[in-house]
Structures are given as structure tokens and as C-alpha cells.
């Protein structure tokens, strides 16, 4: 018994000694959980700080993009964007028959004329459009666009405007821009189905102008409206960026409805509307209009008209000036369903024109047409219309905004998109244009039947090959007939108009290689 007590005492003493040597007891489970939770909180906060830093860096880093729609630099929040785009068109014009109207021009500019007073239409290569574009958006709603033109041997500004999108139903555009008038004109130059636009667009309705316009979309984007106040241009005119010379403004208005837009209906591709312009136009006098070309700014307020092959077939007399009201009206429509597309337009212009005393000397130089001749003011009415049809053989959907091939061209894997196009377009000039103010003589008129035709009618057919969304090869064949003048030769028209002959027909083959991005 004594031995057991002694042994227990020894063991107890040893255990106590070891416990004292081991130090304080282990931490409780609660303490360890608290320490672990604290470490997790620290790591979580570090992760949050890293994410915040990454988000801050992301918000301040611009996004660079490159693709088939161009090149862009965009702020991280998408509120500020600048884009670089371009349009290049290389054309060839081949004339099987036709005339280049250079009559009534100085020898220095025209050279020697044939027995009929014409040069044959000249075959040529040309750069039709060379247009780099800088466009973008500031603060998410202020769009801008700047497009110069380097084709034609000189530089000019095509577009230069700001478009403030305050609301889909209320936008304000200011600067130089396409007038909200012609349907075909509002189609991009890269998306038009033919190499050249119709007589409605190129001859009657305005091209670009300088001013301000309010526009927008109503009724769920089913009704588009536009009202503008612009400087005003002659028929088919493209205003320069300089100051206006006559101080009068032109009012433009357009309503266009797409009532079945976004509906699952065969009519969802139908659009129709009407546009108009009005001004009181006063042309400048004492200018040498005879020596001007169709590309010159006709500051007499009156236009020259081009045939489908881009040769002048009508010009006013050098003594004629715009002198009063000018009203244009244009009903218009399009229809797209599947691969089929149709555009139809009509336009009429009513222009007050007067004759002036004198005119440019035969040898050129400053004119003496400084005074309006009394009782010569006359309202002349010209009109034009067109119907154009397109059909995509490869089954893509036709649209107002161009074609995107189902398959890009690649040997062995795809042939792009193929499209057939056909158009009939004509323009008719007021009979009174070619008579004197009394209406009894063909001499002393507002235009001369020996150099100008009364009407032009063009049949155009062609094919478009879209290699991809950016590249197109186009081929057009155009046949234009002229009625009532411009074929009389070098002899002036007589008072009775008995020696009027029609201008020779124009047969032209036009080709184009286009790159747009």
C-alpha cells in the first residue's frame, strides 16, 4: 500500500512538472476562428481594392476597334467615339455613241468641233469619289461628320455638320449636309444601285446645302419628318462652303412613312412620302455664263442638266437668270421584300426666269447682262421621274442601306452576292423654255434649241457583284434618247424652229470598282 501511494505521488509530481514546462494552455477554438475571419476580411478587402483599381483603369482606357465598318477609338463608357471611314470609286466610261456638249465654248476650252458642233463623248478613266470621312459622337448624343472630296482634280468639302440627338423624335443638324428632300439622294453614295443617280436626283432635286434642319422619328419609328432652313441651291446643286451670294434662304420639308416597319408582314419593307422646297431665287447678273461648265457654280441661279452618261444636254441661255419663286415637289416611295427592291420618284420644279439685256460676248469675257428685260419673267415647269428595280440572285435581303453577302468571295468557298438592276428615268423641260417671252419665236428664248434638248429618256441595266461587304464591282449599260433639239449642227435655230434636229443617242458602258469601309 505504501508503495502504491509513493508511486502515485511520483507520477503526479512528474505530470505537474511537465505541465509547467509546456507553458500556457492552447488557444480556444473561438479565438482561432476570430483570427481566421480577420485574415479572410483582410484578403477580401485587398481583392476589392484590386477590383476597384481595375475598374478605374478600365474606365480611363480607350477602346480601339478595327473592322469592316472602319476604324474607331472609343471611350470606355461609350460616350465618346471617333471613327475613320472611307469611300473609293474608280470608274471607266466607254461611249459607243454620243456627244460631249462643248458648243458655245471658246476654242481654248473646246478645241476644234466637228461639222455638227460636237466633240464625240470621250472615253475615260476617272476617280469618281475619293472620300475619307471622320465621324463620331461626343457625350453620347452629339454626332459629327467631316467628309472631304479629292476626286475631280481638286479638293472640296462634301459634308461638314453636327447632329444633336436630343431625343429620337427631336434632332437638330447644322452645317453642310444632304438636303432632306430626295429619296435616292439620301441613300449613301456607296449603296446606290447604279453608277449614277437618276434625273430626279441629279437634275431636279437639291444635293447638299448649308443650313440647319430639325428632324426625327415618330410613332415608333414609323414616321420620319424633317424641316430645314438652308441657303438654297439650283437644281441638282451642291453648295460650296462659302457665304451665300443672294442673301435669300430656302425652306425644305419632308415626311416619309414606313407604317408596317418591324411587322411580320409582306408590307414591312414599304415606305412612301413627299418632300418639297421653296425659295425666292435671284440670280446674279453681269457674269460670263457661256464659259462656265456644269461643274462651275452657276451663280445665275439656273442649272445645267446632264444625261445618264454625264454629258451636258441642256443649259440655259447666257441672258437668262433666276428671278422669282422656285418650288419643288417630290412624291417618293420604296419597297423591299426578300431579294427584291424597288424605288420610284417623281419631281417637278417651278422656277421664275427672266431675260437680261445683253449677254456674254461671242469671244468670252465679262458679260453685259446687267438689266432685267421688262415683261420677260416666266414660270417654267420641268419634271422628271424614275423607277428602279433590283434583284439579288444569291438570295440576300435587299435593303435601302446596301447589301451584305451571305458568303464573301473566295475561290472554292464563296462567290459573294450578285445583283441585277434596271431603271427607266426621264426628264422633260417646259416648252416655253425654248420660246421667246411672247411665245411666238424660237429665237431670243430662255434656252437655245440648237444647243439644248427638250427631253432625255434613259434605259439603264446593270449587274453588281459584291465580293464582300466592303468591295463591289459594278457594270451599267445606258441608252439615252433626246427629243427636240441639240442636233441642229453649227447653224443657229431659226425663228420658226423648222431646222430643229434631235441630238444623237448616247450609248454608254460604265464600270466601277468600289471600296467602302
Kindly give the residue locations of the regions a language model identified.
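Bacterial N-terminal signal peptides that target proteins for export
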Residues: 1-3
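Residue-level detection of beta-strand scaffold positions
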Residues: 40, 51, 80-82, 169-170, ...
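Outer-membrane beta-barrel pore domains
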Residues: 118-119, 266-268, 276, 284-517
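A short catalytic or substrate-binding loop motif that flags glycine-/basic-rich loops and adjacent residues
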Residues: 64-65, 205, 324-325
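N-terminal periplasmic/intermembrane-space "pro-region" immediately following the signal or transit peptide
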Residues: 6-7, 13-89, 95-107, 112, ...
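Outer membrane beta-barrel
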Residues: 69-282, 381-413, 417-435
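Intrinsically disordered, low-complexity regions of eukaryotic proteins
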Residues: 22-23, 28, 39-41, 93, ...
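Helix-centric, low-specificity signal for extended rod-like, repetitive segments
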Residues: 25, 34-39, 122, 190, ...
Amino acid at each position: 500500500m505504501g508503495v502504491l501511494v509513493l508511486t502515485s505521488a511520483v507520477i503526479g509530481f512528474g505530470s505537474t512538472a511537465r505541465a509547467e514546462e509546456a507553458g500556457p494552455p492552447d488557444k480556444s477554438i473561438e479565438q482561432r476562428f476570430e483570427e481566421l475571419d480577420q485574415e479572410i476580411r483582410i484578403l477580401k478587402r485587398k481583392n476589392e481594392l484590386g477590383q476597384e483599381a481595375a475598374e478605374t483603369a478600365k474606365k480611363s482606357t480607350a477602346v480601339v476597334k478595327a473592322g469592316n465598318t472602319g476604324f474607331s477609338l472609343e471611350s470606355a463608357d461609350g460616350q465618346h467615339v471617333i471613327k475613320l471611314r472611307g469611300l473609293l470609286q474608280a470608274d471607266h466610261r466607254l461611249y459607243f455613241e454620243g456627244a460631249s456638249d462643248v458648243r458655245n465654248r471658246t476654242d481654248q476650252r473646246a478645241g476644234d468641233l466637228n461639222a455638227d458642233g460636237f466633240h464625240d463623248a470621250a472615253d475615260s478613266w476617272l476617280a469618281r469619289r475619293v472620300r475619307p470621312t471622320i465621324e463620331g459622337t461626343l457625350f453620347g448624343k452629339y454626332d459629327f461628320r467631316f467628309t472631304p472630296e479629292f476626286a475631280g482634280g481638286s479638293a472640296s468639302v462634301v459634308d461638314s455638320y453636327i447632329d444633336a440627338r436630343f431625343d429620337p423624335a427631336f434632332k437638330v443638324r447644322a452645317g453642310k449636309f444632304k438636303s432632306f428632300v430626295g429619296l435616292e439622294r439620301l441613300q449613301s453614295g456607296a449603296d446606290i444601285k447604279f453608277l449614277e443617280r437618276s434625273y430626279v436626283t441629279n437634275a431636279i432635286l437639291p444635293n447638299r446645302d448649308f443650313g440647319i434642319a430639325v428632324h426625327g422619328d415618330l410613332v415608333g419609328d414609323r414616321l420620319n419628318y424633317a424641316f430645314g432652313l438652308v441657303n438654297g441651291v439650283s437644281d441638282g446643286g451642291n453648295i460650296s462652303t462659302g457665304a451665300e451670294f443672294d442673301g435669300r434662304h430656302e425652306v425644305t420639308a419632308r415626311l416619309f412613312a414606313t407604317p408596317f416597319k418591324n411587322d411580320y408582314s409582306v408590307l414591312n419593307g414599304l415606305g412612301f412620302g413627299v418632300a418639297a422646297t421653296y425659295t425666292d431665287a435671284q440670280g446674279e447678273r453681269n457674269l460670263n455664263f457661256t464659259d462656265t461648265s456644269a461643274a462651275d457654280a452657276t451663280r445665275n441661279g439656273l442649272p445645267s442638266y446632264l444625261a445618264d452618261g454625264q454629258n451636258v444636254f441642256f443649259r440655259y441661255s447666257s441672258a437668262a437668270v433666276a428671278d422669282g419663286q422656285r418650288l419643288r415637289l417630290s412624291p417618293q416611295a420604296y419597297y423591299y421584300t426578300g431579294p427584291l427592291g424597288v424605288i420610284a420618284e417623281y419631281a417637278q420644279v417651278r422656277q421664275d426666269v427672266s431675260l437680261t439685256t445683253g449677254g456674254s460676248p461671242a469671244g468670252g469675257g465679262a458679260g453685259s447682262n446687267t438689266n432685267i428685260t421688262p415683261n420677260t419673267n416666266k414660270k417654267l415647269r420641268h419634271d422628271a421621274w424614275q423607277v428602279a428595280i433590283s434583284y439579288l440572285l444569291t438570295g440576300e435581303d435587299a435593303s435601302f442601306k446596301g447589301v451584305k453577302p451571305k458568303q464573301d468571295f473566295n475561290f472554292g468557298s464563296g462567290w459573294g452576292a450578285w445583283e441585277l438592276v434596271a431603271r427607266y428615268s426621264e426628264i422633260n423641260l417646259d416648252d416655253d423654255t425654248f420660246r421667246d417671252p411672247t411665245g411666238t419665236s424660237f429665237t431670243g428664248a430662255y434656252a437655245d434649241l440648237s444647243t439644248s434638248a427638250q427631253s432625255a429618256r434613259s434605259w439603264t441595266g446593270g449587274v453588281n457583284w459584291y465580293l464582300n461587304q466592303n468591295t463591289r464591282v459594278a457594270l451599267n449599260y445606258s441608252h439615252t434618247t433626246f427629243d427636240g433639239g441639240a442636233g441642229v449642227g453649227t447653224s443657229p435655230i431659226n425663228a420658226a424652229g423648222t431646222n430643229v434636229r434631235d441630238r444623237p443617242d448616247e450609248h454608254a458602258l460604265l464600270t466601277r470598282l468600289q471600296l467602302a469601309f
